[in-house]
Every structure is written in C-alpha cells, then in structure tokens.
Amino acid sequence: MNFLTYKLLNLEELKILKLNLNKQNELWESGKMTAGSQASKVKENLQLNRNSEISKKYSQLIRKKIITNPLIKSFALPKTIHGIMFTKSLQNMHYGRHIDNPFMSSGRSDLSFTISLTNKADYQGGELVIETLNSEKKLKLDAGEIIIYPSTYLHSVKKVKNGERLVCVGWIESYVKSIEEREYLFDLDAGAKGLLAKYGRSDELDNIFKSYSNLLRLLGN
C-alpha cells in the first residue's frame, strides 16, 4: 500500500486551528518563496510565514498528532517529520505538476503529506492529483483528513474555481527509504497485530514480531 488516508484531526482541533489561522492576514505570503527553481514556475498559492509563532505552534501540534498515531507510525516508520507549512489557495490559484525536492534543509523527503483544513464542499476545483507509473489519483479530502504518499511521485493541485482551499503540508523522512520495503513491513506488522488481537499472544507470534523487529533493524537507516 503506497497511500494512506486517515482522519487525523477532530472537529474541535479543526475549529481552533482555522479560527487562529484566519486571523493572520498579514502573515500569508507567496508560496513561491519555498519552492525550488523548477516548482516555483508553476506554484501559485499562499503560505503562512513559517517563522511566525503561530506557524511554529501549530506545526508542533501537527507533528505530535502524526508521530503518536499508531497506524501512521506503522505505515511511514517516521524518523523525522519536517517542513510543515500551512498553505491557502484562493480562486484561480493552483500548483502545477512538480516533484518535491529529495533533500531539504530539514531532512530527506521520503513521504509527502497533505492535511485538509476545509471541507471539500467549501471549494470547487483544487483537487490533489498524484501520478503513479500507470495511473492518476485525483482526490479531495474531508476536513481533518490526511493523505500520505511517496515523495517520488509527480503531483499537482488543480486550479481552485471558487472558495478557499486551506491545507497543511509537510514531509516525512522514514527509517526505511524503499517504498516496497515499507509496504512489506507494514503488511507484516498489521498482520501480526491483527492475529494478536484475534487470538492473543503465542510463541509463533513472538517469532513473527521478532522477525519484524530484526527486518526493521536490517532495512532501517
């Protein structure tokens, strides 16, 4: 499984987050400021100043929500969660087809994530498009929902036709770089935990958990 979609933020967290972000009109600036030389040519959105206190405060909240979530930990095997920023796309804004930088000042980008802070009914257009080798995944998230996907994929955000698209984005440096190896480990972990919940502890399960842990040591970096 290369993608993970999950309801990360509850209604109260969303309400507080949106209320405080919408008060910061003077802190929203051009998104081109953090794009690479190639991506800046196709990036047309706004982002909250990353050095502002409110950006730092809520970036910490997002980081904590991700790192403490058991499902995300099993899927992404996060070593560091970095580059978190809040972005806004108003009418006619978009982010064209691009690839994320492999290395940033804050870490390597193995996985990218987007968290929707607005309901998908609040704006038209603005779909996140992720291109795999043989297909195109186009989606709009429910408010509070996160999608995590490999940073190796080309992706884009379609033009917002009306309304406002408010999201949080960031990157994960994983202990395991390989997409395939992360998928194998995730399946093994999920299967073992499922058997534990259904049948309880056993010597056979101990061996499976041992193999998972030792594979993680072998494949991790």
Swiss-Prot record:
Cofactor(s) needed: Fe(2+); L-ascorbate
Cofactor note: Binds 1 Fe(2+) ion per subunit.
Start and end residues of each Fe2OG dioxygenase domain: 80-174
Transmembrane intervals: none
Alphabetized UniProt keyword annotations: Dioxygenase, Iron, Metal-binding, Oxidoreductase, Vitamin C
UniProt: Fe cation binding residues: H98, D100, H155
Keyword Metal-binding listed: yes
Positions annotated to bind 2-oxoglutarate: R165
Iron-sulfur recorded as keyword: no
Entries under NCBIfam families matching the protein: PRK05467.1-3
HAMAP family: Hydroxyl_YbiX (MF_00657)
Name assigned to this protein: PKHD-type hydroxylase P9515_13321
